Amino acid sequence: MFDILVYLFESYIHANACPASDQLARKLSAAGFEDEEINEALDWLAGLRRVAAETHPCVAPSRSAVRLYSDYECTRLSAACRGFLTFLEGAGVLDAVSRELIVERAVALSNFTITLGRLKVIVLMVLWQREQPVDTLIIDELLSSDDDEGAPLLH
């Protein structure tokens, strides 16, 4: 599923440039992806679109505010993942709304262990969906793999 998400990022400049789900599924199948992975990715993307559309901008929290994670979020997101989100927010890459979308979409992946590499793909996809400008160095970092899975995610 994560390979499909990276493929979409590389193939479409913005989420709005993606074709409709049925046409996208055919394109992904023609590109060699498995039907099960395609369905997982499309379901996850539909959830991202739904949550992003429902999310209303909030009053920006104070720069000194700290996000406290629930016990369940802590079981789903390792200290490294939570630290990475804090780093991105402190660096100005993420705002509070993006961070919350990332946490929600990561927790929604109950069938997957959320490694740092997978979290980076989730971050990339949330920024892509929200069409937020991202520095090239940040994109390189998000496409690099820190997991035991090895190779960079760039195709």
From Swiss-Prot:
| Recorded superkingdom | Bacteria
Q: Which InterPro entries match?
A: Smg
Protein family according to the UniProt entry: Belongs to the Smg family.
Protein name (database record): Protein Smg homolog
Specify the species: Azoarcus sp. (strain BH72)
